[in-house]
Amino acid sequence: MAFLKKSLFLVLFLGLVSLSICEKEKKEQEDEDENEEEKESEEGSEEKRGLLDTLGGILGLGR
């Protein structure tokens, strides 16, 4: 009976450890995805600013 308890404890412990590792990797992946989205939105806003500067120069609305 003691052997069965130890085996069950070992299986549960290893399952929790692997679950913890998977959750950690998932969080890291989500953080990387968020960082990529922020970079893409920054690039888009830079393109818009460049376009507005160009249009302002053409229309004589310069600084």
Curated annotation (Swiss-Prot):
Keyword terms: Amidation, Amphibian defense peptide, Antibiotic, Antimicrobial, Immunity, Innate immunity, Secreted, Signal
Organism: Nyctimystes infrafrenatus (White-lipped tree frog)
Signal peptide positions on this chain: 1-22
Region of interest (Disordered), ranges: 25-63
Cleaved propeptide residues: 23-49
One annotated GO biological process: innate immune response
Function: Antimicrobial peptide with selective activity. Is only active against Micrococcus luteus (MIC=25 ug/ml) and not against Bacillus cereus, Escherichia coli, Leuconostoc mesenteroides, Micrococcus luteus, Pastewella haemolytica, Staphylococcus aureus, Streptococcus faecalis and Streptococcus uberis.
Protein name: Frenatin 1.1
Cell compartments where the protein resides: Secreted
